[in-house]
Amino acid sequence: MTELLLIVSIAGARVAIATADVESVVELEGLTPVPRAAAHVAGLSALRSRVLTVIDSVAALGLGSSAPKAQREAIVVDIDGHPYALIVEAVEDVVECEGAVQPVRTALDPGWKRVARGVVEVDGDLLLLIDAHALIAGPAAMAA
């Protein structure tokens, strides 16, 4: 099976996200905090007349929070008609993956385990394939 994957860095790790889940890649400039929102919700931002709920991917994994920056790279995904921006450290490339998704055969931190769909081989490296929906749900989803 051939699948296009977006390679990004989150919490210092190179990971893959299926491009079918990705609407666009953007640089976020303005971020408005949301009082009493979950810790992994970094705030709200506007993009082409749409309001995006911005998710701190590091916090969503339960690994602290992303370093504050004036401009942040983000992946825009749409879930049930609601647009979200997932903050990432870097966007690397879109690659074609011809192999099947393999099960994870190593111990992962609970946050990574919750979002892992499996591992894929990209240019000789094994990368964790993550589920954007699970990342948006945040660390509270682990307790449920």
Regions found by a protein language model. Give the residues of each.
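An acidic, low-aromatic, low-complexity terminal/linker signal
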Residues: M1-A144
